[in-house]
Amino acid sequence: MGNTVERPIEAVAWMERSLENSVSTVYIDDMKIIGGDWNGMMICWSREGDILWETNLGDRVAGIRLSTDGAMLWCIAGREAIGIDYENGTIKWNIEFDGSTDLIELDGENRAWIVSSVYDIELNDFMESAISLIDSGDIVEKYILDERPWSIHPFEEGKAFFGLGRPKTGVLELTEKKGKLMHKHNSIHDSPVLCGSHLPPFYLGHSNGMITKIDEKGNIMNLELNKKHGSAIIDISSNNEQILICLENKQIICLNKDGEEENSLEVLDSEGHPEFLDIIDGSTSDGLVNFWIVTSTNNGSLLINANRKNESSNIKLKIKANSRIRDIANAKGMTVVGLDDGRIIAIEEKMLTRRIRENEKSDEEGDVQRFEMLERLRKLRE
């Protein structure tokens, strides 16, 4: 892995703000940073760190999406879906569901798909789930199922795919026709879906290490991997060039779009257990494909910055936090991290790259000095 820089998260923070309770979700775009906590408080800052507004949604904020026109934030919190004015934080509408709201993705300009579920504490299992298509404050239609959907993949307006858990597993396809949701179940294999990527073509990770692909035409297929990985895929992320998967056995594997493994990293026991991945949006200042690996440790978490160079993956930086990282998001050269202790840390990519290079230069100078000293000692012994 080469020389790896280690820093406390406070040392690389461009900005630090805080919520009263544990952070449950973070959001960032080219103008604003938003954080939501487990008690429903949501605060919006400018990217310079000035507070713009705050509002209370009453329960754990689980997801934030910005409408395509940039006017409305679509949020889920507790048992509700909520519409919030992007400029001032005013609540415009809300819809209450029978169970907790788990997932949200937009459907065109003024609608969204919502996954909600009812959990039985005594049985320690999900009793029932619902997929709802909403139009602002109204439910257009609802589809009830026994399985818990673990991912939403909007295909076109009025049509989306959902990765299913047990008992049915596979991929559910819902299409709106004349105000009704038509359903089609695609049985891939009996391994439940655990996660899914967010950009088309979509990739779904299964508990047996297999990947399902939904291409740009809506075709569903098993991605033919050139190597089999029996470990569960706990997170998956993709961009235009590659797919990154995080396995339960602590391997991080990079695949090309044909399913061929290009390289891999292994998270060491001392680095904790990997929880999720995040590919850094857009081109970075060093011209490399950069990504974050978030792990949980005995005394907090690690935020690991890695990149791909010359067909190999390398860990460049380990950022230590004494609190668990709950969520991460990035946009336009800035990464935002939400911590269990309520802090929200913003990391500016250019500043971070500069510090890594300064450290590498310092290490190189130190290596030269050590070599020269050893040479002088050797000559003295001659």
Task: Please state what every model-predicted region is.
Residues 21-27, 59-68, 97-109, 145-157, ...:
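Repeated scaffold domains used in trafficking and secretory/extracellular systems
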Residues 14-41, 56-62:
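Beta-strand-rich domains and repeat architectures in extracellular enzymes and scaffolds
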Residues 1-22, 48-50, 137:
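A short helix->beta-strand "capping" segment at the edge of beta-propeller domains
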Residues 305, 320-382:
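Blade-level signature of beta-propeller repeat domains, shared across WD40, Kelch, NHL, RCC1
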Residues 43, 82-83, 132, 170-173, ...:
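WD40 beta-propeller blade core
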Residues 46-50, 85-89, 134-138, 175-179, ...:
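Short loop/turn segments that connect beta-strands within beta-propeller blades
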